[in-house]
Amino acid sequence: MVVEDESLLLQAVTKKLIASDIEAVSCLSAEQALDYLKSLPELPDAIWLDYHLKDMDGLMFMKNLKANPLWEKIPVFVVSNSASPDKVNGMLALGAKKYILKAEHRLDEIIASIKEFIMTDN
């Protein structure tokens, strides 16, 4: 699942995931992602989460996710343009698997990292 409010980036990430043989569900907002999780017959193997979303920040999304026993084990990869120590530590404390700074990694590298995690952890 990709939760990203920049539509062009959302499309690019989704296409790259599909090209890497990873099924992807695209969500433009945190609320859409949470609603989608309620309706999915099967939980996603991982979530790509942008920290800065229009409807809620990544921290609030993580709190909502971890409050549901059905969703609390879904691995979350936070992918953001900003990475203050407070943000990074807060997300990792809530169980994010990794906090990735967009500017420091190519899209292919981020997707390879997520794919490797999915393949080795499941």
Q: How would you label these PLM feature ranges?
A:
Residues E42-L53:
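Active-site beta3 strand of CheY-like receiver
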Residues G58, L92-K98:
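As written
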Residues D21-S29, Y36:
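Short hydrophobic/Thr-rich beta-strand motif most characteristic of the beta2 strand and flanking loop
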Residues S29, D57-K63:
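Acidic catalytic/metal-coordinating carboxylates
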Residues M1-L8, V13-L17:
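Conserved acidic segment of CheY-like receiver
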Residues A103-I114:
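C-terminal output helix
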Residues K54, S84:
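The feature encodes the CheY-like receiver
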